[in-house]
Amino acid sequence: MPTSATAVAPSTGSVQKKDQDWRAILSPEQFRVLREKGTENRGKGEYTKLFDDGIYSCAGCATPLYKSTTKFDSGCGWPSFFDAIPGAIKQTPEAGGRRMEITCAACDGHLGHVVKGEGFPTATDERHCVNSVSLKFSEISSQ
């Protein structure tokens, strides 16, 4: 169930844990994706079709990563965002150069990939293709 979010500032500290500590707080699927760079099945993620107002945080360390205002339906089968909260993610080029791996800047958890230049009508022409299992959604309640 979504929780209420108040702040949208990314974590500035580095979250480091041993594998046994990550296993204690993550589900087996979360561990496989976040810590072993896996990918969840296309179209099966909890947040693929969620477009409520809120914040998407790292499921591993709770660092806010994406605002719902940057989420869009790309049709790829995973949650898609055109931009992250500044400083929240790291991008690392993969072999071939077309895709960039994205990880949480605080805990290095694998989130997914960024693909650029696909022509989506967004402000950045980027698609951050993120595994739902890497995320935790917090609804922003209207006041």
Curated annotation (Swiss-Prot):
Q: Which domain of life is it from?
A: Eukaryota
Name any one Pfam family assigned in the record.
SelR
Spell out the catalytic residues. 129 (nucleophile)
- Catalysed conversion reaction: L-methionyl-[protein] + [thioredoxin]-disulfide + H2O = L-methionyl-(R)-S-oxide-[protein] + [thioredoxin]-dithiol
Q: Which InterPro entries match?
A: Met_Sox_Rdtase_MsrB, Met_Sox_Rdtase_MsrB_dom, Mss4-like_sf
Describe cofactor binding as the record notes it: Binds 1 zinc ion per subunit.
Recorded GO molecular functions are: metal ion binding; peptide-methionine (R)-S-oxide reductase activity
Keyword annotations of the record: Cytoplasm, Disulfide bond, Electron transport, Metal-binding, Oxidoreductase, Redox-active center, Transport, Zinc
Annotated residues that bind Zn(2+) are located at 58, 61, 104, 107
Task: Look up the record and name the cofactor or cofactors this protein needs.
Answer: Zn(2+)
Keyword Zinc included in the entry's annotation:
yes
**MsrB domain location, by residue?**
19-140
- The UniProt entry's coiled-coil ranges are none
GO CC annotations, alphabetized: cytosol
Protein's cellular compartments: Cytoplasm, Cytosol
What Enzyme Commission number(s) does the record list for this chain?
Answer: 1.8.4.12
Q: Which cysteines are joined by disulfide bonds?
A: 76-129
Known function: Catalyzes the reduction of methionine sulfoxide (MetSO) to methionine in proteins. Plays a protective role against oxidative stress by restoring activity to proteins that have been inactivated by methionine oxidation. MSRB family specifically reduces the MetSO R-enantiomer.
Q: Which family does it belong to?
A: Belongs to the MsrB Met sulfoxide reductase family.
Indicate what this protein is called per its UniProt record. Peptide methionine sulfoxide reductase B9
